[in-house]
Amino acid sequence: MPEICPICGLPKDLCVCEEIAKEEQKIKVYVTKRRFGKLMTVVDGFDADLIDVKDLAKKLKDICACGGTVKKDSIELQGDHRRKAEETLIKMGFSKDMIDVR
């Protein structure tokens, strides 16, 4: 018996909850200054119940070739990676209209 999605009630192989969540979430990408004047790119606005934020952070860190962490459903990347993060999120299926880059 296949696993059932707790959100939509469909089998896991037919579940589209994550795809729908990617299209509907308002994501903010911005840069902040941290200690010693270092820049930190923050990608915020994910619903951790619908999207695997840790897996997404791993992919972003690999593509941007930087370090980073996940804190309170947001991803922090070391350095200024706003454009790369935006391009990567669009390639992963997030809607371009719902990504706000500052």
From Swiss-Prot:
Task: Give this protein's Gene Ontology molecular function annotations.
Answer: mRNA binding; translation initiation factor activity
Protein's organism:
Methanococcus maripaludis (strain DSM 14266 / JCM 13030 / NBRC 101832 / S2 / LL)
Q: Which CDD domains match?
A: YciH_like (cd11567)
**Keyword Chaperone: yes or no?**
no
Query: Which superkingdom heads the taxonomic lineage of this protein's source?
Result: Archaea
Residues annotated as coiled-coil are none
A Pfam short name: SUI1
The protein's matches in InterPro entries, at most eight in alphabetical order, are given as: DENR/SUI1_TIF, SUI1, SUI1_arc, SUI1_arc_bac, SUI1_dom_sf
Record family assignment: Belongs to the SUI1 family.
Enumerate the UniProt keywords alphabetically: Protein biosynthesis, Translation regulation
GO BP annotations listed: formation of translation preinitiation complex; regulation of translation; translation reinitiation
User: Know the name of this protein?
Assistant: Protein translation factor SUI1 homolog
